[in-house]
Amino acid sequence: MSCQPFTSTDTFIPLNSESSATLPLIMHPSAAECLPVSNHATNVMSTATGLHYSVPFCHYGNQSSTYGVMAGSLTPCLYKFPDHTLSHGFPPMHQPLLSEDPTAADFKQELRRKSKLVEEPIDMDSPEIRELEKFANEFKVRRIKLGYTQTNVGEALAAVHGSEFSQTTICRFENLQLSFKNACKLKAILSKWLEEAEQVGALYNEKVGANERKRKRRTTISIAAKDALERHFGEQNKPSSQEILRMAEELNLEKEVVRVWFCNRRQREKRVKTSLNQSLFTISKEHLECR
């Protein structure tokens, strides 16, 4: 037999602390067949399948009662909730939502662990901090050695990576005034730039060194060698290639040195003759004017 809702002829007396010991509970005639009276809530749950309404699990942790059982009382509630009132109450919650999912619990623990790591302050004596300080000092020294200013570095990086790089950024990095996260990001960029700048500097130094090697050192000729060359110049001011080679071997000089000496000597002789001619012309002109 199924349970039926109360009619107008069915009455019951509410229980309270004063009348619970004297007044009997008037129950529906067929109530005993629907729900046996039990002193434990688990018996009510086991017989709840015969009721007209579902008995959802209570999601409040501090309550052990269910719909159909009076909270804090051992007397069962035998009336039926109307459907429209049940629809406005708390909807039944699925069991997976009520129970703690192990995967979700692990995820929450991992999230709390990561957030804790983010919030923890950086240890100033950590190896990462020491390495960052060492790189900042080395970067400044190597930048100055290469001849670049902070503005040069900022403009070079801004042309490649964007306008967020400037002289102020490089200055704050060298003075360790950036956050640890931003300093680590900038360290990788500056390390790459420094490597490229040193490669360019090495190529430039190699080119300059090659040009310097082309210029030979000035040769010093001894007084005895100069006297011998002067005698040869008095005899022949334009010696041939064979004569230059012979003189170079005799004086233990390079052939090119002897050749250049004769060229310079002829130029000096020419300047002396020109100067003498001008002086003679000036003297002659003055002498004629005096007459």
Swiss-Prot record:
Domain POU-specific: 124-198
CDD domains per UniProt: homeodomain
DNA-binding region: 214-273
InterPro entries (alphabetical): HD, Homeobox_CS, Homeodomain-like_sf, Lambda_DNA-bd_dom_sf, POU, POU_dom, POU_domain_TF
Cellular component per GO, a single term: nucleus
Keyword set, alphabetical order: Activator, DNA-binding, Homeobox, Nucleus, Transcription, Transcription regulation
Subcellular compartments: Nucleus
PROSITE patterns from the UniProt entry: HOMEOBOX_1, HOMEOBOX_2, POU_1, POU_2, POU_3
Pfam families for this protein: Homeodomain (PF00046), Pou (PF00157)
TM regions (residue ranges): none
A single BP term in Gene Ontology: positive regulation of transcription by RNA polymerase II
Main location: nucleus
SUPFAM superfamilies: Homeodomain-like, lambda repressor-like DNA-binding domains
GO MF: DNA-binding transcription factor activity, RNA polymerase II-specific; RNA polymerase II cis-regulatory region sequence-specific DNA binding
Motif (9aaTAD): 5-13
Quaternary structure annotation from Swiss-Prot or TrEMBL: Interacts with PITX1. Interacts with LHX3. Interacts with ELK1.
Family under the similarity heading: Belongs to the POU transcription factor family. Class-1 subfamily.
Function, in words: Transcription factor involved in the specification of the lactotrope, somatotrope, and thyrotrope phenotypes in the developing anterior pituitary. Activates growth hormone and prolactin genes. Specifically binds to the consensus sequence 5'-TAAAT-3'.
Domain comment as written in the entry: The 9aaTAD motif is a transactivation domain present in a large number of yeast and animal transcription factors.
The name this protein goes by in its record: Pituitary-specific positive transcription factor 1
